[in-house]
Curated annotation (Swiss-Prot):
<keyword id="KW-0255">Endonuclease</keyword>
<dbReference type="GO" id="GO:0033897">
    <property type="term" value="F:ribonuclease T2 activity"/>
</dbReference>
<dbReference type="GO" id="GO:0005576">
    <property type="term" value="C:extracellular region"/>
</dbReference>
<keyword id="KW-0378">Hydrolase</keyword>
<keyword id="KW-0540">Nuclease</keyword>
<feature type="glycosylation site" description="N-linked (GlcNAc...) asparagine">
    <location>
        <position position="74"/>
    </location>
</feature>
<keyword id="KW-0325">Glycoprotein</keyword>
<protein>
    <recommendedName>
        <fullName>Ribonuclease M</fullName>
        <ecNumber>4.6.1.19</ecNumber>
    </recommendedName>
</protein>
<dbReference type="InterPro" id="IPR033130">
    <property type="entry name" value="RNase_T2_His_AS_2"/>
</dbReference>
<dbReference type="InterPro" id="IPR036430">
    <property type="entry name" value="RNase_T2-like_sf"/>
</dbReference>
<keyword id="KW-1015">Disulfide bond</keyword>
<feature type="active site">
    <location>
        <position position="115"/>
    </location>
</feature>
<feature type="disulfide bond">
    <location>
        <begin position="5"/>
        <end position="22"/>
    </location>
</feature>
<feature type="active site">
    <location>
        <position position="111"/>
    </location>
</feature>
<dbReference type="InterPro" id="IPR001568">
    <property type="entry name" value="RNase_T2-like"/>
</dbReference>
<feature type="disulfide bond">
    <location>
        <begin position="13"/>
        <end position="58"/>
    </location>
</feature>
<feature type="disulfide bond">
    <location>
        <begin position="66"/>
        <end position="118"/>
    </location>
</feature>
Length: 238
């Protein structure tokens, strides 16, 4: 099991502590990233879907593919071996690959190999009685748990921003609606072809990335959307 950290562990990116199992560094800015996949449509029609959990450096740069020895090509079987069947079925629904279900596994592999291996607080050395790939299951569970606290679809809907073939929206209204579920901090809002496509919610973390305290923080990248006329196309029901 992962070692426990004290509740008064320092907050990442807010002090220059040495990296440790209880201090995320250099990747101290943790981003929970989401997709709105409408072309082709993916995931439930009334929910955004998971992209990942990324450890960005505190200046917005990032490392990637940090540990060749822990790159895996069998995420599904790792989770099954850990009896994480409920997690796996949730991921199939809310963490799908836009190219289709047969690509889900490669998408999950990509997210772990590129980003998960760079989270220093889930290194095997941070575990007691570690067993191989234990941190992989913990990573995917943590991403899902964090995603469940960030219901972007409902936050937008509560502000009157709903998928539509013809309505368009203002960036400031979108940001305000999403800031309401993120302690007043708007996420990065990403557009493609003038339509909503991605969200990045930024956090600093007290303690480990697994089970630590995620504290909403300012985004390190400005939206690439225009100020108004933003489309939010419905997902097709097929």
């Amino acid at each position: 099991t992962i070692d426990t950290c004290s509740s008064d562990s320092p907050l990442s990116c807010q002090t220059d502590n040495e990296a440790s199992c209880c201090f995320n560094s250099p990747g101290g800015s943790l981003l929970q990233t989401q997709f709105w996949d409408y072309d082709p449509s993916d995931g439930p029609s009334d929910s955004w879907t998971i992209h990942g959990l990324w450890p960005d450096n505190c200046d917005g740069s990032y490392q990637e593919y940090c540990d060749d020895s822990r790159e895996y090509s069998n995420i599904t079987s790792i989770l099954e071996a850990q009896d994480r069947t409920e997690l796996l079925s949730y991921m199939k629904e809310y963490w799908p690959d836009y190219e289709g279900a047969d690509e889900d596994e490669s998408f999950w592999e990509h997210e772990w190999n590129k980003h998960g291996t760079c989270i220093n607080t889930i290194d095997p050395s941070c575990y007691t009685d570690y067993y191989a790939q234990e941190e992989v299951g913990d990573f995917f569970q943590q991403v899902v748990d964090l995603f469940k606290t960030l219901d972007s679809y409902t936050a937008l809907s509560d502000a009157g921003i709903t998928p539509s073939e013809d309505a368009t929206y203002k960036l400031s209204d979108i940001e305000d609606a999403l800031a309401a579920i993120h302690d007043g901090y708007p996420p990065y809002v990403g557009c493609e072809d003038g339509a909503l496509s991605q969200l990045y919610y930024y956090f600093n973390v007290k303690g480990s990335a697994i089970g630590g305290t995620y504290v909403a923080s300012e985004r390190l990248e400005d939206s690439n959307c225009k100020g108004s006329g933003i489309k939010y196309p419905p997902k097709s029901s097929s």
